[in-house]
Amino acid sequence: MMRPRLPGALSLALAAALLSAAAVLAGPPPTETRPATDDLHGVKLMDPYRWLEGSDAPEIAAPDPALDARVAAWTDAQNAYSRRILDGLTGRDLLAERLAELEEVGTIEAPTVRGGGAGGDLYFYRERRGEQAQAVLYVRRGLEGESRVLVDPVEVDASGLTTIAWYEPSRDGKLLAFGLYRGGDELATLYLLRVADGEWLAEEISGKVRGVFWLPDGSAFFYRRLAEVENPYSAQIRFHRVGRHHRHDPVVFEQYKEGPLATTWGPVALTDHEARWLALMYHTGTDSNDLWVYDVERFVTTGELEEIEIVRGENATFTPLVIGDALYLHTTLDAPNGRVVAVDPARPAREHWREILPERDKAVLEGVSHARGRLAAHYLVDAATRIELFDLEGRPLGAVDLPGLGSARLTTEPERDEAFLTFQSFHQPASIYRVDLGSGERTLWARPEVPVDPTLFTVRQVFYASKDGTQVPMFLVYRKDLELDGGNPTILSGYGGFSVSQTPRFSSRNVPWLEAGGVIAVANLRGGGEYGEAWHRSGMLERKQNVFDDFIAAAEWLVASRYTDVAHLGVAGGSNGGLLTGAALVQRPDLFSAVFCAVPLLDMLRYQYFLMARFWVPEYGSAEDPEHL
Protein backbone atom coordinates (compact mmCIF):
# COMPACT_ATOMS: atom_id res chain seq x y z
CA MET A 1 0.00 0.00 0.00
CA MET A 2 1.30 3.45 -0.94
CA ARG A 3 2.05 5.61 2.06
CA PRO A 4 1.33 9.34 2.30
CA ARG A 5 4.24 11.31 0.91
CA LEU A 6 3.88 14.18 3.39
CA PRO A 7 4.66 13.33 7.03
CA GLY A 8 1.47 13.77 8.98
CA ALA A 9 2.82 16.06 11.69
CA LEU A 10 4.48 18.35 9.19
CA SER A 11 1.39 18.42 6.99
CA LEU A 12 -0.94 19.29 9.82
CA ALA A 13 1.47 21.99 10.89
CA LEU A 14 1.29 23.32 7.36
CA ALA A 15 -2.50 23.25 7.46
CA ALA A 16 -2.49 25.12 10.74
CA ALA A 17 -0.14 27.67 9.25
CA LEU A 18 -2.42 28.15 6.26
CA LEU A 19 -5.38 28.77 8.52
CA SER A 20 -3.61 31.24 10.79
CA ALA A 21 -1.02 32.88 8.57
CA ALA A 22 -2.83 36.20 8.55
CA ALA A 23 -1.80 36.67 12.15
CA VAL A 24 1.92 36.38 11.34
CA LEU A 25 2.24 39.92 10.02
CA ALA A 26 0.51 43.16 10.75
CA GLY A 27 -2.47 44.01 8.57
CA PRO A 28 -2.19 44.60 4.83
CA PRO A 29 -0.95 47.91 3.41
CA PRO A 30 -3.51 50.68 3.94
CA THR A 31 -5.79 51.62 1.07
CA GLU A 32 -6.33 55.23 0.09
CA THR A 33 -9.93 56.43 0.12
CA ARG A 34 -11.42 58.95 -2.27
CA PRO A 35 -14.98 60.24 -2.02
CA ALA A 36 -17.46 58.97 -4.61
CA THR A 37 -21.22 59.08 -4.18
CA ASP A 38 -23.98 57.37 -6.15
CA ASP A 39 -27.68 58.15 -6.11
CA LEU A 40 -29.21 54.72 -6.52
CA HIS A 41 -32.95 55.16 -7.01
CA GLY A 42 -33.05 57.84 -4.33
CA VAL A 43 -30.58 56.17 -1.96
CA LYS A 44 -27.19 57.86 -1.44
CA LEU A 45 -24.29 55.39 -1.39
CA MET A 46 -20.64 56.17 -0.63
CA ASP A 47 -17.91 54.26 -2.47
CA PRO A 48 -14.48 55.41 -1.23
CA TYR A 49 -12.66 52.71 -3.23
CA ARG A 50 -14.16 53.53 -6.64
CA TRP A 51 -10.78 54.80 -7.82
CA LEU A 52 -9.45 51.22 -7.84
CA GLU A 53 -11.51 50.58 -10.98
CA GLY A 54 -8.92 52.69 -12.79
CA SER A 55 -9.52 53.62 -16.40
CA ASP A 56 -11.96 50.71 -16.75
CA ALA A 57 -14.60 52.71 -14.88
CA PRO A 58 -17.44 53.56 -17.29
CA GLU A 59 -17.35 57.20 -16.16
CA ILE A 60 -13.82 57.62 -17.53
CA ALA A 61 -13.95 58.37 -21.24
CA ALA A 62 -10.22 58.07 -21.99
CA PRO A 63 -7.36 56.13 -20.36
CA ASP A 64 -5.83 57.85 -17.32
CA PRO A 65 -2.21 56.60 -17.08
CA ALA A 66 -1.59 58.30 -13.74
CA LEU A 67 -4.65 56.69 -12.16
CA ASP A 68 -3.79 53.28 -13.61
CA ALA A 69 -0.25 53.60 -12.21
CA ARG A 70 -1.66 54.21 -8.72
CA VAL A 71 -3.92 51.17 -9.06
CA ALA A 72 -0.95 49.06 -10.18
CA ALA A 73 1.14 50.29 -7.24
CA TRP A 74 -1.65 49.37 -4.82
CA THR A 75 -1.92 45.91 -6.40
CA ASP A 76 1.84 45.37 -6.20
CA ALA A 77 1.88 46.30 -2.51
CA GLN A 78 -0.97 43.89 -1.70
CA ASN A 79 0.75 41.10 -3.64
CA ALA A 80 4.04 41.71 -1.85
CA TYR A 81 2.24 41.45 1.50
CA SER A 82 0.61 38.18 0.45
CA ARG A 83 3.89 36.74 -0.81
CA ARG A 84 5.64 37.45 2.50
CA ILE A 85 2.99 35.39 4.28
CA LEU A 86 2.77 32.56 1.76
CA ASP A 87 6.52 32.21 1.23
CA GLY A 88 7.06 31.82 4.96
CA LEU A 89 4.66 28.94 5.50
CA THR A 90 6.07 25.93 7.33
CA GLY A 91 6.50 22.95 5.01
CA ARG A 92 5.77 24.93 1.87
CA ASP A 93 8.75 23.50 -0.04
CA LEU A 94 7.72 19.92 0.70
CA LEU A 95 4.16 20.65 -0.35
CA ALA A 96 5.39 22.25 -3.59
CA GLU A 97 7.54 19.19 -4.29
CA ARG A 98 4.58 16.84 -3.87
CA LEU A 99 2.36 19.02 -6.05
CA ALA A 100 5.03 19.14 -8.75
CA GLU A 101 5.21 15.34 -8.67
CA LEU A 102 1.46 15.11 -9.16
CA GLU A 103 1.39 17.75 -11.90
CA GLU A 104 3.94 15.74 -13.87
CA VAL A 105 1.34 13.04 -14.38
CA GLY A 106 0.03 13.13 -17.94
CA THR A 107 -3.51 13.71 -19.14
CA ILE A 108 -5.42 12.26 -22.08
CA GLU A 109 -8.84 12.96 -23.59
CA ALA A 110 -11.39 10.72 -25.25
CA PRO A 111 -10.77 10.52 -29.00
CA THR A 112 -12.82 11.99 -31.81
CA VAL A 113 -13.28 9.36 -34.53
CA ARG A 114 -13.61 10.00 -38.25
CA GLY A 115 -13.86 7.68 -41.22
CA GLY A 116 -10.43 7.32 -42.76
CA GLY A 117 -11.32 5.35 -45.87
CA ALA A 118 -9.86 1.97 -46.78
CA GLY A 119 -6.95 2.36 -44.39
CA GLY A 120 -9.21 2.37 -41.33
CA ASP A 121 -10.77 4.94 -39.03
CA LEU A 122 -8.81 7.90 -37.69
CA TYR A 123 -8.68 8.56 -33.94
CA PHE A 124 -7.84 12.16 -32.99
CA TYR A 125 -7.00 12.94 -29.37
CA ARG A 126 -5.09 15.31 -27.11
CA GLU A 127 -2.55 14.01 -24.63
CA ARG A 128 0.00 15.61 -22.34
CA ARG A 129 2.70 13.20 -21.33
CA GLY A 130 4.60 13.79 -18.13
CA GLU A 131 7.52 15.67 -19.65
CA GLN A 132 5.42 17.85 -21.96
CA ALA A 133 4.57 21.44 -21.10
CA GLN A 134 1.30 21.39 -23.07
CA ALA A 135 -1.08 18.82 -24.49
CA VAL A 136 -0.24 17.60 -28.00
CA LEU A 137 -2.78 16.67 -30.66
CA TYR A 138 -2.22 13.16 -32.03
CA VAL A 139 -3.87 10.99 -34.65
CA ARG A 140 -3.70 7.23 -35.08
CA ARG A 141 -5.14 4.98 -37.76
CA GLY A 142 -7.16 2.29 -36.08
CA LEU A 143 -7.76 1.94 -32.36
CA GLU A 144 -4.38 0.29 -31.74
CA GLY A 145 -2.44 2.09 -34.48
CA GLU A 146 0.75 4.07 -34.00
CA SER A 147 0.21 7.65 -32.82
CA ARG A 148 1.42 10.52 -34.98
CA VAL A 149 1.84 14.14 -33.87
CA LEU A 150 -0.40 16.60 -35.69
CA VAL A 151 0.01 19.75 -33.56
CA ASP A 152 2.64 20.25 -30.86
CA PRO A 153 2.23 23.72 -29.31
CA VAL A 154 5.85 23.78 -28.12
CA GLU A 155 7.04 23.32 -31.70
CA VAL A 156 4.87 26.30 -32.63
CA ASP A 157 6.08 28.39 -29.70
CA ALA A 158 9.09 27.31 -27.63
CA SER A 159 8.02 29.54 -24.72
CA GLY A 160 5.39 26.96 -23.72
CA LEU A 161 2.67 29.64 -23.59
CA THR A 162 0.77 28.41 -26.65
CA THR A 163 -1.99 25.84 -26.14
CA ILE A 164 -4.54 24.01 -28.29
CA ALA A 165 -7.91 25.59 -27.57
CA TRP A 166 -10.05 23.16 -29.60
CA TYR A 167 -9.99 21.01 -32.72
CA GLU A 168 -12.53 19.66 -35.20
CA PRO A 169 -11.73 17.17 -37.99
CA SER A 170 -13.75 17.14 -41.20
CA ARG A 171 -16.16 14.25 -41.58
CA ASP A 172 -13.78 12.28 -43.84
CA GLY A 173 -10.80 13.02 -41.58
CA LYS A 174 -8.80 14.65 -44.38
CA LEU A 175 -8.73 18.18 -42.94
CA LEU A 176 -8.42 19.46 -39.39
CA ALA A 177 -9.52 22.84 -38.08
CA PHE A 178 -7.96 23.81 -34.77
CA GLY A 179 -7.58 26.85 -32.55
CA LEU A 180 -4.47 28.05 -30.74
CA TYR A 181 -4.24 30.29 -27.70
CA ARG A 182 -0.98 32.22 -27.94
CA GLY A 183 0.95 33.95 -25.19
CA GLY A 184 -1.45 32.86 -22.48
CA ASP A 185 -4.45 34.73 -23.95
CA GLU A 186 -7.85 33.19 -24.70
CA LEU A 187 -8.23 34.68 -28.17
CA ALA A 188 -8.11 31.54 -30.28
CA THR A 189 -6.87 31.82 -33.85
CA LEU A 190 -8.14 29.23 -36.33
CA TYR A 191 -5.78 27.22 -38.53
CA LEU A 192 -6.24 24.34 -40.98
CA LEU A 193 -3.97 21.42 -41.74
CA ARG A 194 -4.03 18.41 -44.06
CA VAL A 195 -4.13 15.28 -41.92
CA ALA A 196 -2.32 12.97 -44.36
CA ASP A 197 0.99 14.87 -44.22
CA GLY A 198 0.42 17.42 -41.42
CA GLU A 199 0.93 20.40 -43.73
CA TRP A 200 -0.64 23.64 -42.52
CA LEU A 201 -2.83 25.35 -45.10
CA ALA A 202 -3.02 29.09 -45.73
CA GLU A 203 -6.05 29.71 -43.50
CA GLU A 204 -5.46 31.86 -40.42
CA ILE A 205 -8.58 33.43 -38.89
CA SER A 206 -8.26 35.46 -35.70
CA GLY A 207 -10.93 36.80 -33.36
CA LYS A 208 -11.50 34.29 -30.55
CA VAL A 209 -12.72 31.66 -33.00
CA ARG A 210 -14.61 28.57 -31.85
CA GLY A 211 -17.58 26.43 -32.78
CA VAL A 212 -16.49 25.01 -36.15
CA PHE A 213 -19.06 22.89 -38.02
CA TRP A 214 -18.00 21.26 -41.30
CA LEU A 215 -20.06 20.51 -44.38
CA PRO A 216 -20.05 16.73 -45.05
CA ASP A 217 -17.72 17.03 -48.06
CA GLY A 218 -15.10 19.05 -46.14
CA SER A 219 -15.29 21.98 -48.57
CA ALA A 220 -16.47 24.60 -46.08
CA PHE A 221 -17.54 25.21 -42.49
CA PHE A 222 -19.45 27.58 -40.23
CA TYR A 223 -17.59 29.19 -37.34
CA ARG A 224 -18.07 31.71 -34.55
CA ARG A 225 -15.75 34.66 -33.94
CA LEU A 226 -15.65 38.12 -32.41
CA ALA A 227 -15.63 40.98 -34.90
CA GLU A 228 -13.74 43.03 -32.29
CA VAL A 229 -11.57 40.97 -29.93
CA GLU A 230 -11.92 43.54 -27.14
CA ASN A 231 -15.71 43.56 -27.42
CA PRO A 232 -17.37 40.39 -26.07
CA TYR A 233 -20.68 41.60 -27.53
CA SER A 234 -19.49 41.46 -31.15
CA ALA A 235 -20.02 37.75 -31.85
CA GLN A 236 -20.68 36.63 -35.41
CA ILE A 237 -21.40 33.36 -37.21
CA ARG A 238 -19.51 33.25 -40.51
CA PHE A 239 -19.19 30.77 -43.38
CA HIS A 240 -15.77 29.85 -44.79
CA ARG A 241 -14.89 27.97 -47.97
CA VAL A 242 -11.56 26.16 -47.74
CA GLY A 243 -8.89 27.88 -49.80
CA ARG A 244 -10.68 31.22 -49.98
CA HIS A 245 -9.41 34.22 -47.98
CA HIS A 246 -11.50 34.76 -44.87
CA ARG A 247 -12.12 38.42 -45.70
CA HIS A 248 -14.71 37.06 -48.15
CA ASP A 249 -16.50 35.01 -45.47
CA PRO A 250 -20.12 36.17 -45.27
CA VAL A 251 -21.62 37.06 -41.89
CA VAL A 252 -24.50 34.66 -41.43
CA PHE A 253 -25.68 35.90 -38.01
CA GLU A 254 -24.41 38.39 -35.45
CA GLN A 255 -24.96 39.63 -31.93
CA TYR A 256 -27.93 41.90 -31.36
CA LYS A 257 -26.66 45.46 -31.11
CA GLU A 258 -29.56 47.21 -29.37
CA GLY A 259 -32.96 46.74 -27.85
CA PRO A 260 -34.06 44.26 -25.15
CA LEU A 261 -32.15 41.41 -26.80
CA ALA A 262 -28.80 43.23 -26.64
CA THR A 263 -27.97 41.35 -23.44
CA THR A 264 -28.65 37.94 -24.96
CA TRP A 265 -25.71 35.61 -25.38
CA GLY A 266 -25.34 34.66 -28.98
CA PRO A 267 -25.45 33.89 -31.73
CA VAL A 268 -24.73 30.20 -31.13
CA ALA A 269 -25.03 27.95 -34.17
CA LEU A 270 -24.53 24.25 -34.82
CA THR A 271 -25.17 21.71 -37.53
CA ASP A 272 -25.78 17.99 -37.50
CA HIS A 273 -23.54 15.24 -38.88
CA GLU A 274 -25.17 15.49 -42.31
CA ALA A 275 -25.34 19.32 -42.20
CA ARG A 276 -29.06 19.12 -43.01
CA TRP A 277 -30.06 21.97 -40.72
CA LEU A 278 -28.23 24.92 -39.24
CA ALA A 279 -29.62 25.63 -35.78
CA LEU A 280 -29.40 29.15 -34.35
CA MET A 281 -29.78 30.06 -30.69
CA TYR A 282 -29.77 33.26 -28.66
CA HIS A 283 -29.59 32.76 -24.89
CA THR A 284 -30.85 34.92 -22.04
CA GLY A 285 -28.79 33.87 -19.05
CA THR A 286 -28.56 30.11 -18.60
CA ASP A 287 -32.26 29.34 -18.27
CA SER A 288 -33.81 30.32 -21.62
CA ASN A 289 -33.08 30.59 -25.32
CA ASP A 290 -34.82 31.05 -28.66
CA LEU A 291 -34.28 28.59 -31.52
CA TRP A 292 -34.51 28.74 -35.31
CA VAL A 293 -33.32 26.35 -38.03
CA TYR A 294 -32.21 26.99 -41.60
CA ASP A 295 -31.76 24.74 -44.62
CA VAL A 296 -27.99 24.38 -45.06
CA GLU A 297 -28.09 23.17 -48.67
CA ARG A 298 -30.18 26.16 -49.72
CA PHE A 299 -27.77 28.55 -48.06
CA VAL A 300 -24.71 26.91 -49.61
CA THR A 301 -26.15 26.91 -53.13
CA THR A 302 -28.00 30.26 -53.13
CA GLY A 303 -26.65 32.23 -50.17
CA GLU A 304 -30.22 32.65 -48.93
CA LEU A 305 -31.46 31.89 -45.43
CA GLU A 306 -34.96 30.49 -45.11
CA GLU A 307 -35.89 30.85 -41.45
CA ILE A 308 -38.00 28.30 -39.60
CA GLU A 309 -38.88 29.45 -36.11
CA ILE A 310 -39.00 26.54 -33.68
CA VAL A 311 -39.53 28.39 -30.42
CA ARG A 312 -39.25 31.98 -29.22
CA GLY A 313 -40.01 33.88 -26.05
CA GLU A 314 -40.33 30.89 -23.71
CA ASN A 315 -38.72 30.90 -20.28
CA ALA A 316 -36.99 27.58 -20.91
CA THR A 317 -33.94 26.10 -22.63
CA PHE A 318 -33.94 24.25 -25.96
CA THR A 319 -30.84 22.35 -27.12
CA PRO A 320 -31.25 20.75 -30.56
CA LEU A 321 -29.95 17.41 -31.74
CA VAL A 322 -30.59 16.87 -35.45
CA ILE A 323 -31.16 13.27 -36.57
CA GLY A 324 -32.20 12.96 -40.20
CA ASP A 325 -34.98 15.46 -40.84
CA ALA A 326 -36.07 15.62 -37.20
CA LEU A 327 -35.03 17.86 -34.34
CA TYR A 328 -34.69 16.21 -30.95
CA LEU A 329 -34.94 19.01 -28.40
CA HIS A 330 -33.56 18.65 -24.89
CA THR A 331 -35.77 21.19 -23.14
CA THR A 332 -36.87 22.45 -19.74
CA LEU A 333 -40.21 23.67 -21.13
CA ASP A 334 -42.86 22.35 -18.72
CA ALA A 335 -40.08 20.12 -17.35
CA PRO A 336 -37.57 21.77 -14.99
CA ASN A 337 -35.66 18.46 -14.76
CA GLY A 338 -35.49 18.21 -18.56
CA ARG A 339 -37.14 16.08 -21.23
CA VAL A 340 -36.69 15.32 -24.94
CA VAL A 341 -39.27 16.11 -27.62
CA ALA A 342 -39.09 15.44 -31.38
CA VAL A 343 -39.99 18.26 -33.76
CA ASP A 344 -40.51 18.13 -37.52
CA PRO A 345 -39.22 21.45 -38.97
CA ALA A 346 -41.91 21.14 -41.65
CA ARG A 347 -44.54 21.25 -38.85
CA PRO A 348 -42.86 23.13 -35.97
CA ALA A 349 -46.04 24.13 -34.13
CA ARG A 350 -46.14 22.78 -30.59
CA GLU A 351 -49.22 20.64 -31.17
CA HIS A 352 -47.09 18.49 -33.47
CA TRP A 353 -44.28 17.89 -30.99
CA ARG A 354 -43.78 14.30 -29.81
CA GLU A 355 -42.42 13.54 -26.35
CA ILE A 356 -39.58 11.01 -26.58
CA LEU A 357 -38.06 11.07 -23.08
CA PRO A 358 -40.42 12.37 -20.39
CA GLU A 359 -39.25 14.32 -17.37
CA ARG A 360 -38.24 12.33 -14.29
CA ASP A 361 -38.88 13.34 -10.70
CA LYS A 362 -35.64 12.01 -9.23
CA ALA A 363 -33.18 12.60 -12.08
CA VAL A 364 -32.05 15.63 -14.07
CA LEU A 365 -31.45 15.21 -17.79
CA GLU A 366 -28.14 16.95 -18.48
CA GLY A 367 -27.78 16.17 -22.16
CA VAL A 368 -28.43 13.73 -24.97
CA SER A 369 -26.36 12.54 -27.94
CA HIS A 370 -26.84 10.29 -30.96
CA ALA A 371 -25.11 6.96 -31.57
CA ARG A 372 -26.30 4.95 -34.58
CA GLY A 373 -30.02 5.00 -33.98
CA ARG A 374 -29.68 5.35 -30.22
CA LEU A 375 -30.11 8.24 -27.84
CA ALA A 376 -27.51 8.37 -25.07
CA ALA A 377 -29.07 10.29 -22.18
CA HIS A 378 -26.89 11.70 -19.41
CA TYR A 379 -28.77 11.97 -16.13
CA LEU A 380 -27.71 13.45 -12.81
CA VAL A 381 -28.97 11.63 -9.72
CA ASP A 382 -28.01 13.27 -6.42
CA ALA A 383 -25.09 15.02 -8.19
CA ALA A 384 -23.66 11.81 -9.74
CA THR A 385 -23.89 10.65 -13.36
CA ARG A 386 -26.11 7.93 -14.79
CA ILE A 387 -26.13 7.19 -18.55
CA GLU A 388 -29.02 5.35 -20.24
CA LEU A 389 -29.62 4.31 -23.85
CA PHE A 390 -32.93 4.56 -25.77
CA ASP A 391 -34.05 4.00 -29.32
CA LEU A 392 -35.23 7.02 -31.32
CA GLU A 393 -38.80 6.54 -30.06
CA GLY A 394 -37.71 6.58 -26.42
CA ARG A 395 -37.86 2.85 -25.73
CA PRO A 396 -35.21 1.88 -23.14
CA LEU A 397 -32.17 -0.12 -24.26
CA GLY A 398 -30.39 -0.32 -20.90
CA ALA A 399 -27.86 1.65 -18.89
CA VAL A 400 -24.17 2.13 -19.59
CA ASP A 401 -22.14 0.37 -16.91
CA LEU A 402 -20.10 2.90 -14.89
CA PRO A 403 -17.10 2.07 -12.68
CA GLY A 404 -18.68 3.67 -9.62
CA LEU A 405 -20.15 6.87 -8.14
CA GLY A 406 -18.71 9.81 -10.03
CA SER A 407 -18.85 12.05 -13.09
CA ALA A 408 -19.04 10.51 -16.55
CA ARG A 409 -19.34 11.61 -20.16
CA LEU A 410 -20.07 9.35 -23.11
CA THR A 411 -18.56 10.57 -26.40
CA THR A 412 -20.59 9.19 -29.31
CA GLU A 413 -20.60 9.42 -33.10
CA PRO A 414 -23.85 9.30 -35.13
CA GLU A 415 -22.79 6.41 -37.38
CA ARG A 416 -20.90 4.24 -34.88
CA ASP A 417 -21.62 1.62 -32.24
CA GLU A 418 -18.29 2.51 -30.65
CA ALA A 419 -18.28 5.19 -27.93
CA PHE A 420 -15.80 6.41 -25.34
CA LEU A 421 -16.61 6.85 -21.68
CA THR A 422 -14.68 9.33 -19.54
CA PHE A 423 -15.12 8.63 -15.81
CA GLN A 424 -13.66 10.23 -12.69
CA SER A 425 -14.40 10.67 -9.01
CA PHE A 426 -12.94 12.65 -6.14
CA HIS A 427 -10.20 10.11 -5.49
CA GLN A 428 -9.87 8.50 -8.94
CA PRO A 429 -8.40 10.45 -11.89
CA ALA A 430 -10.19 10.56 -15.23
CA SER A 431 -10.00 7.23 -17.05
CA ILE A 432 -11.24 6.55 -20.58
CA TYR A 433 -13.06 3.37 -21.57
CA ARG A 434 -14.08 2.11 -24.98
CA VAL A 435 -17.72 1.01 -24.95
CA ASP A 436 -19.38 -1.22 -27.54
CA LEU A 437 -22.95 0.04 -27.44
CA GLY A 438 -24.19 -3.07 -29.21
CA SER A 439 -22.86 -5.59 -26.70
CA GLY A 440 -22.38 -3.28 -23.71
CA GLU A 441 -18.76 -4.39 -23.35
CA ARG A 442 -16.51 -1.84 -21.63
CA THR A 443 -12.71 -1.96 -21.88
CA LEU A 444 -10.09 0.41 -20.51
CA TRP A 445 -8.56 2.60 -23.24
CA ALA A 446 -6.39 5.02 -21.22
CA ARG A 447 -5.70 5.76 -17.56
CA PRO A 448 -3.03 8.11 -16.19
CA GLU A 449 -0.51 6.57 -13.81
CA VAL A 450 -1.01 8.84 -10.81
CA PRO A 451 1.23 8.29 -7.73
CA VAL A 452 -1.77 8.11 -5.42
CA ASP A 453 -3.32 5.16 -3.61
CA PRO A 454 -7.10 5.70 -3.92
CA THR A 455 -7.79 2.94 -1.39
CA LEU A 456 -6.55 5.28 1.35
CA PHE A 457 -9.59 7.52 0.97
CA THR A 458 -13.33 7.36 1.30
CA VAL A 459 -16.07 9.43 -0.31
CA ARG A 460 -19.28 10.04 1.59
CA GLN A 461 -22.41 11.93 0.59
CA VAL A 462 -24.45 13.53 3.35
CA PHE A 463 -27.59 15.66 3.40
CA TYR A 464 -28.02 18.57 5.80
CA ALA A 465 -30.75 21.11 6.52
CA SER A 466 -30.30 24.69 5.35
CA LYS A 467 -31.74 27.71 7.16
CA ASP A 468 -35.22 27.22 5.67
CA GLY A 469 -35.16 23.44 6.14
CA THR A 470 -34.22 22.56 2.55
CA GLN A 471 -32.15 19.38 2.38
CA VAL A 472 -28.82 20.05 0.64
CA PRO A 473 -26.32 17.35 -0.39
CA MET A 474 -22.61 17.55 0.31
CA PHE A 475 -19.70 15.30 -0.66
CA LEU A 476 -16.98 14.57 1.90
CA VAL A 477 -13.57 13.13 1.01
CA TYR A 478 -11.01 12.08 3.61
CA ARG A 479 -8.67 9.32 4.75
CA LYS A 480 -10.36 6.17 5.94
CA ASP A 481 -8.56 6.40 9.28
CA LEU A 482 -9.86 9.92 10.00
CA GLU A 483 -11.05 10.48 13.56
CA LEU A 484 -14.01 12.76 14.16
CA ASP A 485 -12.25 14.66 16.92
CA GLY A 486 -13.54 18.10 15.97
CA GLY A 487 -10.15 19.39 14.83
CA ASN A 488 -9.46 18.13 11.29
CA PRO A 489 -8.25 20.79 8.84
CA THR A 490 -11.12 21.13 6.37
CA ILE A 491 -11.67 22.98 3.09
CA LEU A 492 -15.31 23.63 2.19
CA SER A 493 -16.09 24.73 -1.37
CA GLY A 494 -19.19 25.48 -3.40
CA TYR A 495 -20.50 27.37 -6.40
CA GLY A 496 -24.27 27.79 -6.41
CA GLY A 497 -25.03 29.58 -9.66
CA PHE A 498 -25.68 29.48 -13.40
CA SER A 499 -27.08 25.92 -13.16
CA VAL A 500 -23.51 24.61 -12.78
CA SER A 501 -23.43 21.25 -10.99
CA GLN A 502 -20.63 20.34 -8.59
CA THR A 503 -20.09 16.67 -9.41
CA PRO A 504 -17.31 14.32 -8.25
CA ARG A 505 -14.07 15.30 -10.00
CA PHE A 506 -10.46 14.46 -9.35
CA SER A 507 -7.99 17.25 -8.54
CA SER A 508 -4.32 16.50 -7.96
CA ARG A 509 -4.15 19.66 -5.87
CA ASN A 510 -6.38 18.06 -3.26
CA VAL A 511 -4.19 14.98 -2.87
CA PRO A 512 -1.54 16.34 -0.44
CA TRP A 513 -4.29 17.78 1.74
CA LEU A 514 -6.10 14.44 1.87
CA GLU A 515 -2.90 12.44 2.39
CA ALA A 516 -2.07 14.66 5.35
CA GLY A 517 -5.39 13.98 7.05
CA GLY A 518 -7.37 16.96 5.78
CA VAL A 519 -11.02 16.90 4.72
CA ILE A 520 -12.43 18.13 1.40
CA ALA A 521 -16.12 19.10 1.51
CA VAL A 522 -18.09 20.07 -1.61
CA ALA A 523 -21.59 21.44 -1.04
CA ASN A 524 -24.20 21.16 -3.81
CA LEU A 525 -25.85 24.50 -3.19
CA ARG A 526 -29.04 25.92 -4.64
CA GLY A 527 -28.35 27.93 -7.76
CA GLY A 528 -26.58 24.95 -9.29
CA GLY A 529 -28.06 22.38 -11.64
CA GLU A 530 -27.89 19.32 -9.38
CA TYR A 531 -31.69 19.10 -9.10
CA GLY A 532 -32.77 20.81 -12.28
CA GLU A 533 -33.98 24.25 -13.20
CA ALA A 534 -36.12 24.65 -10.07
CA TRP A 535 -32.96 24.16 -7.95
CA HIS A 536 -31.15 26.72 -10.09
CA ARG A 537 -33.90 29.33 -9.86
CA SER A 538 -34.15 28.94 -6.10
CA GLY A 539 -30.62 30.40 -5.91
CA MET A 540 -30.73 33.29 -8.40
CA LEU A 541 -31.91 36.91 -8.45
CA GLU A 542 -33.92 37.75 -5.32
CA ARG A 543 -33.34 34.21 -3.99
CA LYS A 544 -29.52 34.46 -4.04
CA GLN A 545 -29.42 34.57 -0.23
CA ASN A 546 -30.50 30.91 -0.26
CA VAL A 547 -27.08 30.05 -1.72
CA PHE A 548 -25.25 31.82 1.09
CA ASP A 549 -27.53 30.23 3.69
CA ASP A 550 -26.86 26.77 2.23
CA PHE A 551 -23.10 27.35 2.40
CA ILE A 552 -23.16 28.66 5.95
CA ALA A 553 -25.34 25.71 7.00
CA ALA A 554 -22.78 23.33 5.47
CA ALA A 555 -20.03 24.88 7.58
CA GLU A 556 -22.16 24.66 10.70
CA TRP A 557 -22.93 20.99 9.96
CA LEU A 558 -19.23 20.17 9.58
CA VAL A 559 -18.51 21.72 12.97
CA ALA A 560 -21.53 20.16 14.69
CA SER A 561 -20.66 16.73 13.24
CA ARG A 562 -17.11 17.05 14.62
CA TYR A 563 -15.34 16.86 11.29
CA THR A 564 -13.67 20.15 12.17
CA ASP A 565 -13.97 23.30 14.22
CA VAL A 566 -13.90 27.00 13.41
CA ALA A 567 -10.14 27.18 14.00
CA HIS A 568 -9.50 24.52 11.34
CA LEU A 569 -12.16 25.40 8.76
CA GLY A 570 -11.36 27.21 5.52
CA VAL A 571 -13.62 27.95 2.57
CA ALA A 572 -12.73 28.26 -1.11
CA GLY A 573 -14.46 29.40 -4.28
CA GLY A 574 -13.79 31.10 -7.58
CA SER A 575 -15.78 33.39 -9.90
CA ASN A 576 -19.41 32.97 -8.77
CA GLY A 577 -17.92 30.82 -6.00
CA GLY A 578 -15.74 33.81 -5.09
CA LEU A 579 -18.90 35.85 -4.62
CA LEU A 580 -20.15 33.00 -2.43
CA THR A 581 -17.10 32.91 -0.16
CA GLY A 582 -16.96 36.70 0.00
CA ALA A 583 -20.59 36.88 1.10
CA ALA A 584 -20.06 34.09 3.64
CA LEU A 585 -17.10 35.95 5.11
CA VAL A 586 -19.12 39.16 5.44
CA GLN A 587 -22.17 37.45 6.91
CA ARG A 588 -20.41 34.96 9.21
CA PRO A 589 -16.80 36.04 9.89
CA ASP A 590 -16.91 34.02 13.11
CA LEU A 591 -17.37 30.72 11.26
CA PHE A 592 -14.17 30.45 9.20
CA SER A 593 -10.46 30.87 9.81
CA ALA A 594 -9.37 31.11 6.16
CA VAL A 595 -11.07 32.25 2.96
CA PHE A 596 -9.80 31.66 -0.57
CA CYS A 597 -11.81 34.05 -2.72
CA ALA A 598 -10.61 33.72 -6.34
CA VAL A 599 -11.57 36.04 -9.24
CA PRO A 600 -14.78 36.99 -7.44
CA LEU A 601 -17.65 39.31 -8.21
CA LEU A 602 -17.85 41.47 -5.11
CA ASP A 603 -19.21 44.85 -6.25
CA MET A 604 -22.69 43.73 -7.20
CA LEU A 605 -23.83 47.32 -7.75
CA ARG A 606 -21.45 47.88 -10.67
CA TYR A 607 -20.29 44.46 -11.93
CA GLN A 608 -22.45 44.73 -15.07
CA TYR A 609 -20.32 47.58 -16.45
CA PHE A 610 -17.20 45.46 -16.94
CA LEU A 611 -16.04 42.97 -19.58
CA MET A 612 -18.81 40.51 -20.53
CA ALA A 613 -20.70 40.79 -17.25
CA ARG A 614 -23.92 42.13 -18.70
CA PHE A 615 -24.57 38.57 -19.88
CA TRP A 616 -24.89 37.71 -16.18
CA VAL A 617 -27.70 40.16 -15.42
CA PRO A 618 -30.40 37.46 -15.84
CA GLU A 619 -28.64 35.50 -13.05
CA TYR A 620 -27.79 38.30 -10.61
CA GLY A 621 -30.02 41.19 -11.61
CA SER A 622 -28.78 44.75 -12.02
CA ALA A 623 -28.71 47.71 -9.67
CA GLU A 624 -29.93 49.79 -12.61
CA ASP A 625 -33.31 48.07 -12.17
CA PRO A 626 -35.04 49.09 -8.92
CA GLU A 627 -36.96 45.80 -8.98
CA HIS A 628 -33.66 43.94 -8.53
CA LEU A 629 -32.63 45.74 -5.35
Feature locations, PLM:
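N-terminal secretory signal peptides that target proteins for export/translocation
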Residues: 1-7
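Bacterial N-terminal signal peptides
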Residues: 9-22
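Short acidic, Pro/Gly- and aromatic-enriched capping/linker segments at domain boundaries
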Residues: 27-42
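Peripheral, non-catalytic segments that deliver or gate enzyme domains
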Residues: 44-45, 50-51, 55-90, 94-149, ...
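Acidic helix/loop microenvironments that form the catalytic cleft of cell-wall polysaccharide enzymes
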Residues: 496-498, 576-577
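Residue-level detector of anion-binding/catalytic polar loops
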Residues: 519
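Active-site-proximal cap/loop segments of hydrolase catalytic domains
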Residues: 522-629
